[in-house]
């Protein structure tokens, strides 16, 4: 499984095997991921391919500059727990899981098939990951439920962006991390161009005053300290 992130791919295949009743030896389904041999990982990969599971999400690839930047921020603040909003294909979430193996992570997404993929990863051995089908704008989870909230390439898609920001600030105990495109593009799903001034207003309206902005390759990144 050299071209794959083996722990993530193996977890997904094992979780999907349970859902789909694929034939696998019991020990391959229950053995801790870190104890699987190369031969056992190869069996899992072959099973996943035979079942036509979508394994391309788990191929090793170079991190996007914006993802590297956010991971660097998170290494600086060392989150105790994380809520990732709109995880989609795991462009950020998967590297985070690999680089922060001690952090409890909750992912919320509107798309059922995205949530199901992440639930398979959790069921397959990465049980510190919880995936929920949920709308961040209307989620009534208790205040301060998560140390840090990430909204990465998400806010530009949300019609009521102020409501999403309000909820993120309410749910975070310490930080909210945001990335958005900094230039107009032709993506019809991008319904806002969120400039530094606009984001500042949104977070100030939510009661957050301590904001730090940075940028990388066409993206604006915000670290909002909600505890001060």
Model region roles, listed by residue range:
Residues 167-171:
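Conserved helix-to-beta-strand junction in the class I
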Residues 157-158, 184-185:
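Short glycine-rich, flexible loops that bind phosphorylated cofactors or substrates
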Residues 173-182:
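Conserved beta-strand signature within the Rossmann-like core of class I S-adenosyl-L-methionine
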Residues 158-159, 172-173:
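Helix-to-beta-strand junctions that scaffold the AdoMet/dcAdoMet cofactor pocket
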């Amino acid at each position: 499984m050299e071209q794959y992130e083996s722990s993530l791919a193996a977890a997904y295949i094992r979780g999907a095997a349970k859902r789909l009743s694929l034939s696998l030896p019991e020990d391959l389904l229950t053995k801790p991921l870190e104890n699987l041999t190369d031969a056992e990982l190869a069996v899992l990969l072959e099973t996943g391919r035979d079942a036509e599971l979508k394994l391309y999400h788990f191929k090793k690839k170079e991190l996007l500059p914006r993802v590297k930047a956010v991971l660097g921020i998170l290494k600086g603040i060392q989150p105790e727990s994380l809520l990732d909003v709109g995880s989609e294909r795991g462009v950020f979430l998967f590297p985070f899981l690999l680089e922060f193996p001690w952090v409890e992570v909750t992912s919320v997404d509107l798309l059922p098939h995205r949530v199901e993929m992440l639930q398979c990863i959790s069921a397959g051995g990465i049980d510190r990951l919880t995936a929920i089908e949920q709308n961040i704008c209307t989620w009534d989870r208790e205040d301060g439920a998560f140390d840090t909230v990430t909204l990465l390439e998400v806010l530009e898609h949300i019609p009521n962006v102020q409501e999403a920001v309000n909820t993120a600030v309410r749910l975070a105990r310490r930080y909210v991390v945001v990335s958005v495109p900094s230039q107009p593009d032709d993506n019809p799903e991008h319904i806002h161009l969120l400039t530094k001034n606009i984001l500042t207003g949104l977070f100030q309206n939510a009661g957050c005053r301590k904001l730090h902005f940075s940028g990388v390759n066409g993206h604006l990144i915000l670290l909002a300290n909600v505890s001060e």
